[in-house]
């Protein structure tokens, strides 16, 4: 973000670089810390492989302490840290057509509450990574779109209340064929806290 009144100098934000803090885990590649309940949540629920790296320091907004990672916005409520419904916020205004109801099978899951389904690699990832507890409600069928990684590539993507999954054919059959999208990074760009592509 720039401050026009101050000669276009960057306005400090929670995404501004930080120095290592005592008692925190510091990540020099992104120059941010994780500490306290945010670090505990990060360690318990998959660390870098699931949540990604911290992209901000902890900040308070709307009376809640929050911290962005590559893939999520974590917020603290009642002493507990959990992902915020950032996927719902970033997909607001989009219309995702529902599918006709069907009986779920081991290969395809129908979610009656939202009228959407999960199948194939996305369903396997969802089952292996805490499903609704991590990602929240299913918001879409598979759509093809960019992921904010600055490459211009487009991927099959499926939206959830707290994130999105994307399929990377270049990693087919491997551990990284399905990945969490860079939802936290995208949200920070939209806020003007990270440079746009």
Give the residues covered by each predicted segment.
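Extended, compositionally biased repeat/scaffold regions that form elongated interaction surfaces
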Residues: 1-197
């Amino acid at each position: 973000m720039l401050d026009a009144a101050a000669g276009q100098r960057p306005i400090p934000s929670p995404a501004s670089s930080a120095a290592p803090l005592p008692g925190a885990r510091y990540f020099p590649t992104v120059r941010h810390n994780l500490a306290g309940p945010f670090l505990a949540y990060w360690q318990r629920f998959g660390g870098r492989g699931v949540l990604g790296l911290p992209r901000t320091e902890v900040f308070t907004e709307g009376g809640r302490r929050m911290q962005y990672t590559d893939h999520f916005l974590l917020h603290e409520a009642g002493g507990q840290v959990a992902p915020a419904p950032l996927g719902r916020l970033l997909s607001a205004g989009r219309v995702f057509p529902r599918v006709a109801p069907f009986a779920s099978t081991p290969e395809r899951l129908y979610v009656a509450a939202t009228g959407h389904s999960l199948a194939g690699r996305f369903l396997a990832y969802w089952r292996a990574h805490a499903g609704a507890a991590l990602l929240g409600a299913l918001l879409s069928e598979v759509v093809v779109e960019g992921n904010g990684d600055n490459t211009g590539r487009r991927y099959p993507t499926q939206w959830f209340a707290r994130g999105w999954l994307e399929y990377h054919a270049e990693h087919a059959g491997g551990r990284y064929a399905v990945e969490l999208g860079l939802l936290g990074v995208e949200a920070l760009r939209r806020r003007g806290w990270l440079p746009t592509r």
